[in-house]
Amino acid sequence: MLRRALLCLAVAGLVCADAPEEEDHVLVLRKSNFAEALAAHKYLLVEFYAPWCGHCKALAPEYAKAAGKLKAEGSEIRLAKVDATEESDLAQQYGVRGYPTIKFFRNGDTASPKEYTAGREADDIVNWLKKRTGPAATILPDGAAAESLVESSEVAVVGFFKDVESDSAKQFLQAAEAIDDIPFGITSNSDVFSKYQLDKDGVVLFKKFDEGRNNFEGEVTKENLLDFIKHNQLPLVIEFTEQTAPKIFGGEIKTHILLFLPKSVSDYDGKLSNFKTAAESFKGKILFIFIDSDHTDNQRILEFFGLKKEECPAVRLITLEEEMTKYKPESEELTAERITEFCHRFLEGKIKPHLMSQELPDDWDKQPVKVLVGKNFEDVAFDEKKNVFVEFYAPWCGHCKQLAPIWDKLGETYKDHENIVIAKMDSTANEVEAVKVHSFPTLKFFPASADRTVIDYNGERTLDGFKKFLESGGQDGAGDDDDLEDLEEAEEPDMEEDDDQKAVKDEL
């Protein structure tokens, strides 16, 4: 009997030794306990992270806050994390290509976990999970339930229907199913109608900013409701941060106007107020974004727009379609009237795109590798008598730094050639209409001709590879844009950024 008891204790000890630990309500998983955690929890959200990853560090407090909130509610949903640098087998098994990668497991299904795609704040995480595990809209039987829902999140949508089986109520539920990151509630209770000053069916979007609530007006259809929510779910002016980036770039509004404003400036409140006043006329059309130009994390964005800290406050507009296009106001005045006028003129198609260019250095053609800027690009690259091979680079790009000595040797090789020119252009400070650069370094060949031909180089990045390409007239090593490997620099180590944040970096 004693032997049996000791055996049971020993087995229990082994099981406990493999049981997941908890850090701030978040389960710590390893390969040895991953399957056990999936079996123990019906719903499990797992973050694959790296200890050195800046985005993971920024997410950590919000992730823990979400985990604690769900645990306190007695939810079946648990949050977990895996150090993918230590558990490389798990990372490979679940296709982790960047950090953080967050996957949602339901009923222990390892074949097709759902990728988490919502925002990086605790409310976003909780709302997304509840929508994935519960009804599209929570039934609100009384005023207390309604108040709890409304107070639970920055944004909540409530449908007030005296008949919850009506066609309008069904359209409302379809809209609720289409949105993952906002909680929806539905009620037929007369006391709830009275509590929120409704005397007939309606839909209200409640929010903890700006005007506090928006009442839907019009025919209740799924499409109309989604449009109404799109117009009203974000603040009139939203600050660009690590947490808000997914909301900004994941939304349907692809025209963004950005106010670069240091929080330390003396008239900060006044300039932000002017920007907000202008925003009122463009809800659902243009997203108004404020960027703290003093913040270190935002310096790359300033660089992308060709701005320096000392040039701020400043306003720029960008369209995030397939090809991004930037626009600059004609006036540097930051009054509400000027900003409003600029936006109207943009929407009317009266503003020309803004292309950045550095000043042309006096010695731009004195070295074997010629220096191109926006102002001399056309004359050099499309010279009908010259074959011009150009590297489009970024100063911070590690791949570009590795290529630099090879590119210099290539310049030396052809410095006395009668019709071959080796050149480079800093694409973070110069833009040209003829070439869209999506990754760094990008290498393009402009053969001597009158038809403005552009050939992409997709061969080996070696001196011999480049020489073969040039001696073959741009054939040996040529490739289409679709074949180009995306070699945009990631912060070392290579896997720091997840897909959402990499998209932000690609765009900004």
From Swiss-Prot:
Membrane topology, as annotated: Peripheral membrane protein
Modified residues (Phosphoserine): 331, 357, 427
Keywords: Acetylation, Cell membrane, Chaperone, Disulfide bond, Endoplasmic reticulum, Isomerase, Membrane, Phosphoprotein, Redox-active center, Repeat, Signal
Site (Lowers pKa of C-terminal Cys of second active site): 461
Residues with the N6-acetyllysine modification: 200
Site (Contributes to redox potential value): 54-55, 398-399
Source organism, top-level taxon: Eukaryota
Any one GO molecular-function label of the UniProt entry: protein disulfide isomerase activity
EC number, UniProt record: 5.3.4.1
Localization in the cell: Endoplasmic reticulum; Endoplasmic reticulum lumen; Melanosome; Cell membrane
Positions of the Thioredoxin domain: 18-134, 349-475
Matching Pfam families: Thioredoxin (PF00085), Thioredoxin_6 (PF13848)
Residue ranges of the region described as Disordered: 471-508
Record-annotated active site: 53 (nucleophile), 56 (nucleophile), 397 (nucleophile), 400 (nucleophile)
GO cellular component: endoplasmic reticulum; endoplasmic reticulum lumen; external side of plasma membrane; melanosome
PROSITE patterns in alphabetical order: ER_TARGET, THIOREDOXIN_1, THIOREDOXIN_2
Catalytic activity, as annotated: Catalyzes the rearrangement of -S-S- bonds in proteins
GO biological process: protein folding; response to endoplasmic reticulum stress
Record family assignment: Belongs to the protein disulfide isomerase family.
Protein's name in the database: Protein disulfide-isomerase
